[in-house]
Amino acid sequence: MEPSHTTSNNDNILRTINIQKILFDKEQFIPLLSIADPSVNMIQSYLFKGELYILSSNGQAISAAVIISVGDKEFELKNLSTLYNQQKKGYGSILLTKILELYSNADKIWVGTGSPGINKEEFYQISFYKRFGFEYVYTIKDFFKNNYIEPIYEYNGLQCIDMVYLSYTPSHHNKKK
């Protein structure tokens, strides 16, 4: 893929952003993917059956996304991660925007993300996806307790307990353009 964006950071340094589909040596990106999913076994369960996209800036891999087919014209975004020191700078948004463009002919795109299982508490990831047009669909109670050996804690100290699924329907958003 060609460079998709040129942007400036807070220091007004011009940066070139590249988004590339990775076909070989995907395992080299497991450390980056493990920022969003700490289970290497879980990452390996979807990495090699999915499409891996890497966003890099000035030659450094900053964000990664894995999307898999889950049915006829339905896909699931299994992982969207950004280096800790690069979070909240727009890289994840740029990569997600590109993914949504690439899969604009899909009937539906799903994403599952963690929740603390506490009423009126949600992690920033849920509002992040909602900003892009994802809508809440359902919750799998105790998903992280039942599927991960070690507890997973978010930046705010709350434990991931439930898996919250959201969906995005490209045709609803393509009409708005």
Indicate where each model-derived feature is located.
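Active-site rim helix/loop that mediates acceptor-substrate recognition in acyltransferases
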Residues: 27-64
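Conserved beta-strand in the GNAT
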Residues: 54, 60-69, 74-81
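Conserved N-terminal entry element of GNAT/NAT acetyltransferase domains
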Residues: 1-24, 170-177
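Conserved active-site alpha-helix within GNAT-family acetyltransferase domains
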Residues: 93, 116-158
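Conserved GNAT acetyl-CoA-binding A-motif
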Residues: 103-118
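A short, internal acetyl-CoA/4′-phosphopantetheine-binding micro-motif in the GNAT/acyltransferase core
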Residues: 80-88, 114-116
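Conserved acetyl-CoA pyrophosphate-binding loop and the N-cap/start of the following alpha-helix
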Residues: 86, 90-98
